[in-house]
């Protein structure tokens, strides 16, 4: 656990130096929440165990979610293009971001999260990863109604809806 904490501290320091400017800041507290949240998710392929994020994965996820404007505290990035080679986890990263936003953004009520991709098969695979993250975590599962046949997930407490 200490190694993980030291690693996280080093990553946070590096990203804070990179993003802290007069106009933007790197929200370290939210980055810690993201790290903790992801560490509670389990892999949907291979051995079903909790994730150990790699540095590049943490950097991509938190640069999208944790870089904010100083003026109003809103995220700098409203859209993101993840450009990494095939079979390096783009869908995995997208699923983490979607699940984090679906569950951890308290000010979002009745939102519609739509998963899209180049093909229906890719969108279905992304949905399958999101669904696995939720079903494998009893805390997340408790807050949702999952309808696999229509590929729809509805939050019971705030009415947010995720669908393909």
Give residue ranges: language-model regions.
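Phosphate/NTP-binding elements of NTP-utilizing enzymes
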Residues: 1-164
């Amino acid at each position: 656990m200490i190694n993980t904490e030291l690693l996280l501290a080093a990553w946070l320091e590096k990203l804070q130096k990179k993003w802290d400017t007069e106009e933007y800041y790197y929200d370290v507290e939210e980055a810690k929440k993201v790290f903790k949240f992801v560490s509670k998710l389990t892999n949907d392929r291979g051995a079903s165990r909790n994730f150990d994020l790699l540095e590049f994965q943490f950097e991509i996820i938190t640069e999208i979610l944790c870089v904010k404007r100083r003026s109003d505290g809103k995220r700098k990035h409203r859209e993101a293009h993840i450009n990494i080679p095939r079979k390096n986890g783009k869908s995995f990263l997208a699923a983490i971001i979607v699940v984090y936003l679906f569950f951890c953004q308290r000010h979002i009520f009745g939102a519609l999260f739509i998963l899209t991709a180049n093909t229906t098969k890719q969108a279905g695979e992304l949905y399958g990863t999101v669904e696995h993250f939720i079903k494998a975590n009893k805390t997340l599962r408790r807050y949702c109604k999952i309808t696999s046949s229509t590929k729809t997930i509805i939050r019971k407490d705030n009415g947010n809806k995720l669908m393909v």
